[in-house]
Amino acid sequence: MSTIEAEKPRTEVSPRLKLVLELGPLMVFFFANSRGDWLASRFPVLAELGGPIFIATGLFMAATATALIVSWIMTRTLPMMPLISGIVVFVFGALTLWLQNDTFIKMKPTIVNTLFGAILLGGLLFGKSLLGYVFHAAFKLDEDGWRKLTIRWGVFFLFLAVLNEIVWRSFSTDFWVAFKVWGTMPITILFTLAQMPLIMKHSQERESAE
């Protein structure tokens, strides 16, 4: 294979497909938990996993693996955040099924969000705005903009970690599963939209246009 062939540009995933890959596993998790008994009656192999939350965990792991595989096939790369999240899903999902203890899958968002928050805020201590490596393809900001956005996202991830702990320890499993889809996602979308003024203010593309 020639050098030119080896360096073919990567295919960018469309925003719609990216949304499906990110939300798809969560929707599978929600559906499988709410319809666990029905799935168990239709597919005996799933019944062997245990109750609805365990069936949901197994299918969540499968859906997450599928999303990562599709992303790799399309782009020949795996984004850092989905990859880390996927690894934690597989580890904590396996523990959940093996020990028949749903505490592990419930703590997965806490671990992932704490890890992301610590990485982002910890990077700033070494003068690195690591969020830039995640969003660099989407937009370009000046150094001060990346620093401020990194702080905000770092704190937000830690907030989500604390929120997850409160919800799963204080409410039922069904409520927690529903909150993952219909609570956490809207909160994240609203937070993302709230960052637009900061992004516009520090956008280098805007400065170039001027």
Swiss-Prot record:
UniProt signal peptide: none
Q: How does it sit in the membrane?
A: Multi-pass membrane protein
**Transmembrane residue ranges:** 19-39, 53-73, 78-98, 115-135, 148-168, 175-195
The record's subcellular location field reads: Cell inner membrane
Q: Which GO terms describe its cellular component?
A: plasma membrane
Alphabetized UniProt keyword annotations? Cell inner membrane, Cell membrane, Membrane, Transmembrane, Transmembrane helix
Q: Where is this protein primarily located?
A: membrane
Q: What does this protein do?
A: Plays a role in cell envelope biogenesis, maintenance of cell envelope integrity and membrane homeostasis.
What family name appears in the similarity comment?
Belongs to the YciB family.
Listed name of the protein? Inner membrane-spanning protein YciB
Species name for this entry? Sinorhizobium fredii (strain NBRC 101917 / NGR234)
